[in-house]
Amino acid sequence: KRRRTSEAWSRVRAMREGAFRRRAERAALPSTDYEEKTLAKEHAEIGVFGGSGFYSLIENAREVWIETPYGMPSDKIALGEIAGRKVAFLPRHGKDHRFPPQVINYRANAWAMKELGVERIIGPTACGSLKASVKPGDMVVADQIVDRTTGRKDTFYDGPITTHVSFADPYCAQLRPIAIKALRDEGITTHEIGTIVVIQGPRFSTRAESKWFASLGWEVINMTNYPESYLARELEMCYVNISLITDYDVGLEEENGIEPVSHAAVMKIFASNNERVKNGIYRIIENTPKERTCACGSALAGAQG
């Protein structure tokens, strides 16, 4: 099974490299640019998408640009070590937060990680809560996702290969319990079940939308986890989400003591919990075994035809 999926990935990669070279030729660029910039002798086991505050976790960090057939990722990728493991870190919004959620080049970000040899991705996100019991400062290790975005480039398979990848269980079955234990060991109130609904942004929800999401039993709302998590699956990388709750969404305002959502309030909660999130990620990386026992690495098996 692993051999078949490896062959499928090789075919896709060859197809994309060929497309890149053809575009380079049309632009009168040397065809070696792709190999020099993306197939460098850099390597990482684990990738992290997050905010710029996570740079301090990485030891012996160096930064590299990785060019992809889908354009450039959000920023340079920082390579180094965390807990003795080779790690690649990429700020999904760019260092200066210049890319709002609806324009992030999610495909380039995911592809760059794959080119570096990354097999597992940790995706911390700042999120709003749709339930009073899920409080600001808590963390949710999501187990399901609902996509409410529009127009995002959310697949590597626009043709000619028809591919239908299972996304029934969006997050890695091996990484989720590791993340839950790591966060709880850090003393963080952690919810091990949660559905995250991803909205287009950059605006927050209307009151009607928020109440609708909450009425469906969903716990968390965010703007970036899709298609980031799904693209990792298409590239057969494991993905785990860590949702830091920064505020209650607007639909909960009528409940006692709950204030309206604002960007300033979100950033205040995020800043006050940044060290806890970083410590939790360190523990996750430290406790992640090298061998994968999940199905993420064979996601393409039976998906193409």
Question: Residue spans of the language-model regions?
Answer:
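Metabolite-binding pocket within alpha/beta catalytic cores that recognizes anionic/polar moieties
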Residues: 39-168
